[in-house]
Amino acid sequence: MKEIYQQMVEEVLERVNGKKSGLTSEQVKRSREKCGWNELTEGKKKGILQIFFEQYKDFLVLILIASAIISGMFGDVESAAVIVTVITINAILGTIQTVKAEQSLQSLKNLSGPEAKVLRDGTIVQIPARELVVGDVILLEAGDMIPADGRLIENASLKIDESALTGESLAVEKNMDTILTEAPLGDRANMLFSGSFVTYGRGKAIVTDIGMQTEVGKIAGLLKSTSEKQTPLQVSLEVFGKKLSIMILVFCGLLFAINVFRGEKISSAFMFAVALAVAAIPEALSSIVTIVLSFGTQKMAKEHAIIRKLQAVEGLGSVSVICSDKTGTLTQNKMTVEDYYIDGKRISAEAIDISDQAQKCLLNYSILCNDSTNENGVEIGDPTETALINLGSRYGVEAASVRKLYPRNGELPFDSDRKMMSTLHLIDGKNQMIVKGAVDKLLKRTEQIWTKEGIRKITEEDKEKIQRQNQKFSMEGLRVLAFTYREIPKNHTLTSQDEDHLVFLGLIAMMDPPREESKAAVAECIKAGIRPVMITGDHKITAAAIAKRVGILHDLSEACEGADIENMSDEELKEFVPNISMYARVSPEHKIHIARAWQERGMIVVMTGDGVNDAPALKQADIGVAMGMTGTEVAKDAAAMVLTDDNFATIVKAVENGRNLYQNIKYAIQFLLSGNFGAILTVLCSSVAGLPVPFAPVHLLFINLLTDSLPAIALGLEPDRSEVMSEKPRLADESILTKDFLSKIGLEGLVIGAMTMISFLTGYNQNGTLLGSTYAFGTLCLARLFHGYNCKSDHPVIFTKGLFHNKWLQGAFVLGTVLITTVLTVPGFHNLFKVETLNLMQLGCVYLYAFASLPIIQLLKWIRMKLRKRGER
């Protein structure tokens, strides 16, 4: 069966059981029983409890739960309670971040318009848009939102803003012509689409689709079917947690075997192995990562980037492709006059001289032959006409004043057949008709041309020169209007026959220009190893002009249209996308396929946009970024991040923040794991040597939950490093647990473990197990506090200004030092923490062993750095 836009109006009326005079109440009832209400169905939303329990799916958390259960079974209620408390706090934090349920479908539902004017029982009535049915006849005029999809059956110069749906910045001229061939959404000139706006003219349409069957409804379906994806950090932490748990279980199993071999009871050996597992697993890791990410969202909010999904903070830092919408994202979403062409000369809009007679005349005529208004910043009318009004305002020529001085005495409205508009005014005592329209149409009716020397007969050479300039403007993506005029006898009624014998005055070229920051932002992306790609519903030439101006497109061979990829297989598209930097005339489905093709190549994809048409692709992409000022609620709700200033440059800053944040999280993880590895080595060495266990469970819990958490959070707040934007994005499948990262953790843990073991032996030899355990506890605590300075950079920092530039780390170090010193020296704490109260000499010994790990690790960093530089030569 033919599509509705390919059928004659009579065929459409028969197909939907409608008629031009509208439906009767009985017909409305039958249609509603068949098609339902004009609304969108909502997806099933997760409840708070479901979201809360989903926080326990992490493999590391499951290991901790198992450890808590086993600890409780063997009587270690203290350890079990602490573990349960920590993972519960983490689950609450995660729930708070994700409890904002998706509102995309509700936004789409609201977009369909609250009310509609419709013909019912032969009369015009206004009803809630929800009550529309297929077959209804709707009446539309400038300013109306279209409440349902429909076929145009009456047209009076109707123009529709479809930018939110198709991405095309210019209002679309509608007509009733039947389209015989297949046409993309943006080229169906006889159709009206739900959620679009009437900018000019009037019309009637027969409703052909409502609710989920409209083009907006189909996008709603795509939103429901597009699955949520894990961000790179989620993937990395999941892999990391499993590997870490396996390593710890191997260590604990080895220790269990050693203790059984030494003759200990199986229950005691097993309990100790579980205790060690609890000590080794960084209970606070997930919470710390969540807290650091939360701080990141607060920082980014101050820089105009609102994070809706927590992990998107990190995900932005790892993107390798940004697929950006054109209209309103890279451009201002506002038509602006760029150039004049008068008397054979091109004049920039910035260089217009209103003291020049011809330029002032063209400015006035563009305001007079114009139906748009801009009062108190409220623009009403066609965006092209509004651009002409705004240009006048820039030069102090206000539309209201000009129109009052030269009132309109007659008009011939624009229509798609004539492609011109005419108005009649009394100017300087002459009855002047101003005609604007398409260049080729007006040149055919032009007999004279204005020049500085005076008005003379236009020649073929003049016309060819004007056409060449028109083509040049068009190749630059500019929309061009020609302006002509003639004198009409007074008291004459205008007809289309009067649009002849015209005097050519000039051309005005305009476009939706790039944002001022876009070019620099694109250059910064390229410098950072990120591939910018423009995807738009606009025309190829217009889009290519913008893409070239901002630096995305260098050659037209890098541009294509949606039709070029329509029939490509997934594999073909995967091979095709690296060669293309700009896609024009695309549909929402095309956007999803393009994003998926890049993902199949191992790229982490950002999709930016602001229209309804962007929403499904925003969800398909790894990170969806919506515009907050010009963006629809649909796009905002589908996105992981919303830019409150609609500034493409904010994305670049967000990428920089994301990269810094990911590095800071790595520093925090390095800090936690190397310290825990030091504790494991100390316990393992003591067990192998047949010595008493150096730590009581309360020692390990004190370290993990108090003196570890604060420095780890502080490391997550390390000041930004600008050099991160000179680095390439990390690989999509790169785990946090790289060989280099593991080797650093192992080496640093070895140093901390060695100093702790030496300290334990010192105290043990002085006064037995309790003093040795106290020495080991104090040394491990303080060594890990000093270790925070080791983890703040991959390079040595001990003799640099950067050592103390993190105020949060200074605070964490001071607080942690005060806590452990109080526990070791105040007599009242010795029973609670199972320590021996230390004198000043003993405390100094503990501090010395703890501090020694700092210069040793810094020396090892310096050696690694030198070896790496030598290897790069």
Spell out what each predicted region is.
Residues 1-726, 736-737, 750, 777, ...:
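Conserved cytosolic headpiece of P-type ATPases
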Residues 731-750, 770-775:
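Membrane-water interface at loop-to-transmembrane-helix junctions
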Residues 707, 752, 774-788:
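Generic alpha-helical transmembrane segments
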Residues 687-696, 760-772:
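Helix-coil boundary and interhelical linker segments in multi-pass alpha-helical membrane proteins
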Residues 370, 602, 655, 659, ...:
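Alpha-helix capping/termination and helix-coil
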